[in-house]
A protein has these predicted regions:
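PP2C/PPM-type serine/threonine phosphatase catalytic domain
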Residues: 1-213
Length: 213
């Protein structure tokens, strides 16, 4: 079985690379100068997952039919929620729900929202990776209720799409949802530490020893 690298730095490296490539595209032609995008990355070692996002994509973790956690985004509305100036239930309708504080393609460095500790998997866990057009038009309770009604996950997704299309909004943003269900879980392994950082620490220790001697 393949054992991919599994740590915080892997996601950060991929985010930085994506940001670099989008900025390179911006410089190719004037028509791409305003190009920006949101990004959500999930990695796994077959026992746990780590995820991170930039922009207004969203990640949902469903266990036992209920949403047990979801990611935060980089919108002004989310900032207001974090500062307790806005109720989370009102976020979907706030006029600044799509005003981003950062996105892939921004000048300078980005600061991805990456969880610090891995989430241990359980069989039948469900993960949903979505764009803003999905989450701003779907209530989390409706996601749970529809899931309880349909054993077939395709029917569940179809029911959610119908809810989006029935939205009363004048304009519906691009809506995308990718759903993953865990069928089996591997035995646990320790999270791999970044080897390059370890080498730098070893070199630094050697240099200090040499100086002291």
């Amino acid at each position: 079985m393949l054992r991919p690298r599994f740590n915080y730095d892997v996601i950060k490296e991929m985010m930085d690379y994506a940001n670099l490539k989008v900025k390179e595209k911006q410089e190719e032609a004037k028509k791409y100068s305003l190009m920006h995008t949101s990004l959500l990355i999930v990695i796994s070692n077959y026992n746990s997952i780590l995820y991170g996002n930039v922009g207004n994509t969203r990640f949902y973790h469903i266990r036992g039919g209920y949403i047990v956690s979801q990611s935060k985004d980089d919108t002004i509305a989310q900032l207001l929620v974090d500062e307790e100036a806005l109720n989370v239930s009102d976020m979907k309708f706030h006029r600044q729900r799509n005003d981003l504080l950062q996105a892939i393609g921004d000048f300078g460095k980005i600061k991805p929202n990456i969880i610090k500790s891995p989430v241990e998997l359980m069989e039948k866990d469900i993960f949903c990776l979505t764009t803003v057009g999905f989450w701003e038009n779907i209530d989390e309770h409706d996601m749970e209720n529809d899931l309880s009604r349909f054993e077939d996950k395709k029917q569940w997704l179809n029911s959610l799409e119908k809810r989006i299309l029935a939205s009363l909004r004048d304009n519906i943003e691009n809506y995308t949802i990718a759903q993953v269900e865990v069928q089996a879980v591997a035995s646990p392994e320790p999270m791999e530490k970044d080897r390059s950082k370890l080498i730098k620490k070893i070199i630094l220790i050697i240099m200090i020893v040499v100086v002291i001697i």
